[in-house]
């Protein structure tokens, strides 16, 4: 079974219109020339507009230095009109993404990627998985789970969440010798490698649950997931298409986290008066 993630996420997003977003502002910093990022950013800006939050995109050239970008982030940290900051990944090769992420004030970390992010803020991909799990009553207990790919915005936070939650989970990366053997026996598989249609239906067992997290463009410049959809309907019990599967729920998580930060900062301001 697959589903229209965009439609379901949109229906949940509509409920956020009831909140007062007049003093909420999201700033997205883009320091890359990545086509996929353009698509992701567009969806985030549309979501902000839908609920009534302000948003701004700061697009930087490849001439930006590490020091200049950190200075820009610090300036946004101190801007009382900015509620949340997103550093859109990836960044230009000459930039150190980890140092840049750590420069973001945890009180403005919408993505939940800083080391000291607020306890209430989950990484957006994790929040998306939790929402889907609850929405479709997916059972993770006593299931063999495999996460393929350990990127900072995909597989890594998913693996850490599953592990700390006590689920039976294994992680695979490019150095894992028996990845295909592991996923063939898995009940639930998360793919997050960003390689167009790398996995085929034959790689999974009958009745598997599949979360296709990775996004890339094929030779025709079309957005694709890690899993080739051909034959998947007959193999998987439940799966997410890409695009339109997990992605809309990560955007929904951004809006949820932005509101949490707004409320947190409002309480901090009130307590200081």
From Swiss-Prot:
Knockout or disruption consequences: Probably essential, it was not disrupted in a global transposon mutagenesis study.
A Pfam family recorded for this sequence: THF_DHG_CYH
Catalytic reaction annotation: (6R)-5,10-methylene-5,6,7,8-tetrahydrofolate + NADP(+) = (6R)-5,10-methenyltetrahydrofolate + NADPH; (6R)-5,10-methenyltetrahydrofolate + H2O = (6R)-10-formyltetrahydrofolate + H(+)
InterPro entries linked to this entry: Aminoacid_DH-like_N_sf, NAD(P)-bd_dom_sf, THF_DH/CycHdrlase, THF_DH/CycHdrlase_cat_dom, THF_DH/CycHdrlase_CS, THF_DH/CycHdrlase_NAD-bd_dom
Gene Ontology CC annotations of this record: cytosol
Binding sites annotated in the UniProt record for NADP(+): 149-151, 215
Enzyme Commission code: 1.5.1.5, 3.5.4.9
GO molecular function terms attached to this record: methenyltetrahydrofolate cyclohydrolase activity; methylenetetrahydrofolate dehydrogenase (NADP+) activity
Family statement drawn from the similarity comment of this UniProt entry: Belongs to the tetrahydrofolate dehydrogenase/cyclohydrolase family.
HAMAP family named among the record's database cross-references: THF_DHG_CYH
Oligomeric and partner information: Homodimer.
Descriptive protein name: Bifunctional protein FolD
Organism from which the protein derives: Mycoplasma genitalium (strain ATCC 33530 / DSM 19775 / NCTC 10195 / G37)
Taxon lineage: Bacteria, Bacillati, Mycoplasmatota, Mycoplasmoidales, Mycoplasmoidaceae
